[in-house]
Amino acid sequence: MGRFISVSFGLLVLLLSLSGTGANCLPDWSVYEGYCYKVFKERMNWADAEKFCTKQHKDGHLVSFRNSKEVDFVISLAFPMLKNDLVWIGLTDYWRDCNWEWSDGAQLDYKAWDNERHCFIYKNTDNQWTRRDCTWTFSFVCKCPA
């Protein structure tokens, strides 16, 4: 009986410790609404950052946003690490065909940008999306399904 209680308690502790850390996410990634996120301080151009994210997870991409709450969550991750830095996101017209799309194929139904260039960054300080030349280098956020 004592062993059963000890094993049960151990399993409970393990379950509770995994539940808040994104048990389905890679180590050091954060979970929100069924997706895993990680901020990377390394500076890369848009294409290299996207390629890096796809190497982290088979379904990984630069972050896409479906609503303002998701943006707020990502800012809560990125701001402590990057402060006022600009961060690549997965929105692009990389092929310059006037077809704006998320690199992960998500629907483009939430928008917050100005008009210029072909790849997007967001500003941690004011949640503005701004276009930049895709060859510039910035930190970035990767996202993948949990």
Swiss-Prot record:
It is found in: Secreted. SMART domains: CLECT (SM00034). Residues 1-23 form the signal peptide. Residues 32-143 form the C-type lectin domain. Disulfide bonds join C25-C36, C53-C142, C119-C134. Pfam families: Lectin_C. The keyword Transport does not apply. Keywords: Disulfide bond, Hemostasis impairing toxin, Platelet aggregation activating toxin, Platelet aggregation inhibiting toxin, Secreted, Signal, Toxin. The keyword Transferase does not apply. Binding of echicetin to glycoprotein Ibalpha (GP1BA) receptor on platelets alone results in inhibition of platelet aggregation, while binding to both GPIba receptor and IgMk promotes platelet aggregation and signal transduction. Belongs to the snaclec family. This is Snaclec echicetin subunit beta. It comes from Echis carinatus (Saw-scaled viper).
